[in-house]
Amino acid sequence: MSEDKLPELGKIHPAFFDRVIYPKLGAPSGDIVIGPRHGVDYGVLRVGPKYMAFSTDPFFIVPSFGFARAAWFGFHIVFCDVAVSGLTPRYLTIDLNLPPEMTEPELEEMWDAVHAEAVKYGISVITGHTARYTGCNYPMVGGATSIAVGGKRDLRGPGRVKKGDRVVITKGPAIETTGLLAVLFPERFVAAGGEAFQKEAAAVFSRMTVMEDCAIARTFRGVHVMHDATECGVWGGLYEMARAGGYGLRIEEEAIPVLPVIRRTADLFRFDPFAAISEGTLIAMVDKKDAGGLIKALGDEGIPAAAVGEVVNAAEGQKIMGRSGERNLVHPEVDPYWILAAEFSK
């Protein structure tokens, strides 16, 4: 695939974004602290003494999940990208462009779940739009913007990263790929590995969030920047973070934790788990003095984490140290999740 063309599916390539989108961002403003850039999930405004972080995503609803579970996932997709700012998630704006076939009970079940998650995390809905339209289809039933608020000291961003910072990763790769595929296509998993395997893989669905990861990380001043490894997974996330911050990386591939059920899923369906979408995997650049404490604090809450590399000078590039030696970290470009989902749907 050409880097200067639209992909068949998924996010556009950074080169296309840089040519078409990035040069045309409207009027400049001195209130913008962090604007659009690769590898940063949020934008930040200075509003008086406070800082506000914003992130926008599709509102993603898959009816076959069940509307309550689908809404849980949709909510966390929206809020995980702003939670990584280091500020506290507080507000939600939401646009619901509903398919005509959606029923009143389905909408009520969906919205009850959104409300429950908002109450759990202390988040208020402040405005929105709700309507049914022809031409609107699942799973993208609108969009939403999450807003987090805090002080200057709370804000994390690529400018805080320094040489020697440790790269900390939670849960491991392909969390979202495994959880979604096992729920959407249970028969494929049963056929490949049996019913117990399918149930174990489907249970990964509930780990597709970094809200708790970020809440713990916010308590450590040495956490300099965070990123949710969504599209193109761990490799894509690391690439985007290094590009956004202008630093190099040395990553020990064997140090990255991989859940056994995810390793088996990747082996059975023959995809690179490190290149696959992984909502729920937090990547953080952390002062070496705080890395051990953060990993322990996460582990105490049942969130596996490991230090898997370090930040180096930009001139040293982004390198992965694997079983076969050293190689360059490159952006995967195409996420294997979309290929598998299309194949399984046939």
Q: What role is predicted for each listed range?
A:
Residues 1-346:
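Helix-biased detector of long, well-ordered alpha-helical tracts
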